[in-house]
């Protein structure tokens, strides 16, 4: 127990280290259980994405979003997994306006906007034993600002999140879910913090080298609470395929189901587990 306590203290310390991230164009990814399932100790993945009909709330525009340098990495020590990830560069092509921009947002010079982020760091702690029929995990972390309010792709504000998740496997089928709270900063001086529901549900069918999966994930403004600009409800359905075990390729088709999520998109990446 003392050893687990030391790991937990280390995880909390690492989670509180400032690490760059932006705000809310895309929802938080679902937790990847492979390291806690014993498939390895270290994991890394890099890729990119194309998303159509994406809204940039602060700029008041809708268009095509390109994500260059999507990445994530994770390291396991005992029951604890340390996660880091983000997007090196986002390039947005304005196509139509749906609202007036926020006062500090500058007009685009050539129909394009680009900015860094988001980046994030998180800690996941397994709460159950390895033989438990349903595994449980506590996940918490932060996304800190690197974005420029003048660009208008995301708000320059700090976010924190914490979720409780579970996973059950029967044969080749695994189902996982997590839900919790996102405590997000805002651009509204009269309402400086916004609390949203953060959630993800995923099902996958492991047939060896090929693993098809479907994921539903997003964030939801509470009932009876108005949406604050830059903190809107987000939701995506992702139908994907992972090919390979130790080294793998992943491709996902994205369909948004809220006003501020993409109409359609594609995410591709390559990674390795060791």
Can you say where each PLM-predicted feature lies in the sequence?
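Transmembrane beta-barrel domains of Gram-negative outer membranes and organellar outer membranes
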Residues: 23-177, 181-184, 194-239, 246-252, ...
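N-terminal secretory signal peptides that target proteins for export/translocation
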Residues: 1-5
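Bacterial N-terminal signal peptides
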Residues: 7-18
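Acidic, metal/ion-handling microdomains and their immediate structural contexts
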Residues: 191
């Amino acid at each position: 127990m003392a050893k687990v306590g030391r790991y937990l203290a280390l995880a909390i310390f690492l989670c509180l280290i400032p690490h760059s991230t932006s705000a809310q164009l895309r929802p938080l990814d679902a937790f990847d259980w492979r390291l806690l399932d014993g498939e390895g100790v270290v994991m890394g993945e890099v890729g990119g994405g194309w998303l159509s009909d994406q809204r940039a709330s602060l700029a008041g525009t809708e268009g095509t979003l390109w994500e260059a340098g999507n990445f994530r990495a994770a390291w396991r020590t005992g029951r604890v997994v340390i996660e880091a990830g983000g997007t090196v560069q986002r390039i947005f092509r304005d196509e139509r306006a749906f609202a007036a921009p926020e006062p500090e947002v500058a007009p685009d010079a050539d129909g394009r906007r680009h900015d860094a982020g988001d980046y994030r760091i998180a800690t996941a702690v397994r709460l159950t034993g390895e033989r438990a029929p349903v595994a449980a995990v506590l996940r918490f972390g932060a996304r800190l600002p690197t974005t420029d309010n003048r660009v208008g792709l995301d708000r320059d504000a700090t976010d924190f999140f914490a979720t409780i998740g579970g996973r059950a496997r029967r044969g080749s089928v695994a189902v996982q879910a997590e839900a919790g709270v996102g405590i997000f900063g805002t651009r509204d001086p009269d309402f400086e913090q916004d609390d949203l529901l953060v959630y993800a549900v995923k099902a996958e069918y492991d047939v060896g080298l090929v693993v098809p999966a479907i994921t539903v994930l997003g964030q939801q403004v509470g009932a009876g609470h108005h949406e604050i600009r830059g903190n809107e409800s987000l939701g995506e359905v992702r139908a994907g395929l992972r090919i390979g075990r130790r080294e793998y390729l992943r491709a996902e088709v994205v369909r948004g189901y809220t006003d501020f999520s993409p109409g359609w998109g594609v995410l591709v990446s390559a990674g390795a587990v060791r």
